[in-house]
């Protein structure tokens, strides 16, 4: 398995997740979270959509925003990414709204590598 290093550039994280599908993972609240699908975002896109989020200067791996019906935005070394599909330990694969309901994430929480 490949532990996602949120301190890498967003594009490198995206490439590794695609290349190692479905073995990329992280930890959320001490549980294994397999990362199945993400999208790299531009911080300008997020600002233009008027979402409330923390500064992109945040520590990599911090949840910047939780957007209902869209996904969970996470900081990286460069641009943020949006988590679109994942599998929490002991649960089924879920995406977007279902994933948010399953994880119940909060802005400021941390995904560890």
Q: Where are the regions that the model predicts?
A:
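Internal anion-binding site segments
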Residues: 1-113
